[in-house]
From Swiss-Prot:
It comes from the Bacteria. One of its GO terms (cellular component) is ribosome. This is Small ribosomal subunit protein uS11. It comes from Helicobacter pylori (strain P12). Part of the 30S ribosomal subunit. Interacts with proteins S7 and S18. Binds to IF-3. It holds the Pfam family Ribosomal_S11. Located on the platform of the 30S subunit, it bridges several disparate RNA helices of the 16S rRNA. Forms part of the Shine-Dalgarno cleft in the 70S ribosome. Keywords: Ribonucleoprotein, Ribosomal protein, RNA-binding, rRNA-binding. HAMAP family: Ribosomal_uS11.
């Protein structure tokens, strides 16, 4: 019989971090949630597509809410109690994601910033859709 190659799973080390930053990237197609410590080191992340939402369902506000709840439950295991929020992008899940961070028990929101990049007349935008 041939030998099996067994790959050892990486063990998640529990960190004790009191404050974190929630980055919400809401695009037209998906919503990405990343939680970091104050230095910018990633603690955990979650996406709407990674939770099983496929196609146009990824861009819904409900999918964004589920992604936030998933990421915050992982972050609570590391001891995160206070967060700041940085929001980027024009997606539909943006407002819902902010509200669901504030509604989560055991997590206090300290501040909210919009870090969406705005061009000073940069690249030409894509042409209008004709449906």
């Amino acid at each position: 019989m041939a030998k099996r190659n067994v790959v050892a799973k990486k063990k998640v080390v529990k960190k004790n971090i009191a404050r974190g930053v929630v980055y919400i990237s809401a695009t037209f197609n998906n919503t990405n949630i990343t939680i970091t410590d104050e230095m910018g080191n990633v603690i955990c992340w979650s996406t709407a597509g990674g939770l099983g939402f496929k196609g146009s369902k990824k861009s819904t506000p409900y999918a964004a809410q589920q992604a936030v709840e998933s990421a915050l439950s992982k972050a609570k295991e590391h001891g995160v109690k206070e967060v700041g929020i940085k929001v980027q992008g024009p997606g539909s899940g943006r407002e819902t994601a902010i509200k669901s961070v504030g509604a989560t028990e055991g997590v206090k929101v300290l501040w909210i910033k919009d870090i969406t990049p705005l061009p000073h007349n940069g690249c030409r935008p894509p042409k209008r859709r004709r449906v």
